[in-house]
Each structure stands twice: as structure tokens, then as C-alpha cells.
């Protein structure tokens, strides 16, 4: 469960290292989970990269520390809160994705991110 003011690790090579959630898209919602799109501000970035510090970006959540319950009864939990920076067309701004992602991203039509991921759980 991600809410406003939550810090997330960026799991791609767009240049950002950490972002802070400032808005959850999709109505008047308090919390976001895996596969939800948020608006965040870049708090830490690598120099000489496309994404700079204090840029406002869109991102999709790909890992959360909170347990996710699936319909088949399985529960899954990750070690960190992580997101991938996307553009207006929901395509990733980076060319690589680091770490495992949840299968729920495939159901929410983020197939480009799923194809870049090294492992889908």
C-alpha cells in the first residue's frame, strides 16, 4: 500500500534512484498497490541522465512490501517498494528493468514492462 509522501526505489535505468509519491491516479484514492499509476517527484537521481532531480514523473508500482493476496489463495510480498517511470503512453522511459515483478502487471496491460523484466512472479 503506497500513499502520498511514500518513497519508492526506481527499478529502471532512466536516471532516477528514488521518487516520492505525490498523487495516486484513478479517482479519490488513499492507497495504491501493484499495477497502479502514481505521480511522483524525483528525490535522488544519477547525473547526466534524462530524468533529473525535482522532475515530476508518472510511474507504475511494480513491487510493494505489503502482502498481495491472489485469487488462488497465494500471497506474495517483496522486500522493497519499487516503481518504473513511464510516459503518457504507459511505456517505460528506461530501457532496462531491474528485479522481479508481479504477474498483476500483465493483467493491467503493462506488457512492455513485463517483457523487459528478468523475472515475473
Curated annotation (Swiss-Prot):
Task: Spell out the molecular function terms from Gene Ontology.
Answer: large ribosomal subunit rRNA binding; structural constituent of ribosome
Query: Subcellular location, in the record's words?
Result: Plastid, Chloroplast
- State any GO CC term: chloroplast
Q: What is its main location?
A: plastid
Superkingdom in the source lineage? Eukaryota
Q: Which SMART domains match?
A: Ribosomal_L14 (SM01374)
What keyword terms does UniProt attach to this protein? Chloroplast, Plastid, Ribonucleoprotein, Ribosomal protein, RNA-binding, rRNA-binding
Record Gene3D superfamilies:
Ribosomal protein L14 (2.40.150.20)
Q: Which GO terms describe its biological process?
A: translation
| Similarity comment | Belongs to the universal ribosomal protein uL14 family.
Q: State the oligomer form and interacting partners.
A: Part of the 50S ribosomal subunit.
Report the protein's function: Binds to 23S rRNA.
Q: What is this protein called?
A: Large ribosomal subunit protein uL14c
Q: Organism classification, top ranks?
A: Eukaryota, Cryptophyceae, Pyrenomonadales, Geminigeraceae, Guillardia
Amino acid at each position: 500500500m503506497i500513499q502520498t509522501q511514500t518513497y519508492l526505489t526506481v527499478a529502471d535505468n532512466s536516471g532516477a534512484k528514488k521518487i516520492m509519491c505525490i498523487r495516486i491516479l484513478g479517482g479519490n484514492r488513499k492507497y495504491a498497490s501493484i499495477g497502479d499509476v502514481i505521480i511522483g517527484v524525483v528525490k535522488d537521481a544519477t547525473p547526466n541522465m534524462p530524468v533529473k532531480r525535482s522532475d515530476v514523473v508518472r510511474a507504475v508500482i511494480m513491487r510493494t512490501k505489503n502482502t498481495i493476496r491472489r485469487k488462488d489463495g497465494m500471497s506474495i510480498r517483496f522486500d522493497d517498494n519499487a516503481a518504473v517511470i513511464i510516459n503518457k503512453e504507459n511505456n517505460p522511459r528506461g530501457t532496462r528493468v531491474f528485479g522481479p515483478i508481479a504477474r498483476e502487471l500483465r493483467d493491467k496491460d503493462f506488457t512492455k514492462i513485463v517483457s523487459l523484466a528478468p523475472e515475473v512472479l
